Amino acid sequence: MDKIEQKFIGVWELDEWVVEKPNGDKTFPFSGNVDGFLIYHSEGWMSATLMQKNRTDVSNDRSKIAKISHLLKNDHEVSLEGDLLNTTKNYFLAANGYVSYAGEFNADDINVYHNIKTSLLPQWVGTTLTRRHEFTLKNKSLTLSAESDGFKDFLVWKKV
């Protein structure tokens, strides 16, 4: 493992997530009500989890969840009502307020590369997320940034 990659090793807690829009305005995802952890392991693996705090609880009823899953997969004109609709809504909102992925990582002097093996978002599996990195406060703070479609994300992590 390179010297630069050694700086990443450990557990990092999300301190702030800011998005700069194409017009220059800044916004805070989930209204700033966000938590997360970023873990880098010395064997070259990483895991990232970000979530909106205080999400609505979801059902633990496996039968109900299986029924909804079956309906959504097999009935192209499915119509959910009542409790099934409410359960589906809560699961959608829970997933919409959550991002998680894991895989191998490597870094150079400018960027860290997350080579995605598993993810909540299926389209990320097999891709590489490139993040510009900056260490401050004697390597106890890490800012990762990325730009996509004119939006610039800045995530500030504090070493745990």
Predicted features along the sequence, with ranges:
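Lipid interaction determinants
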Residues: M1-V160
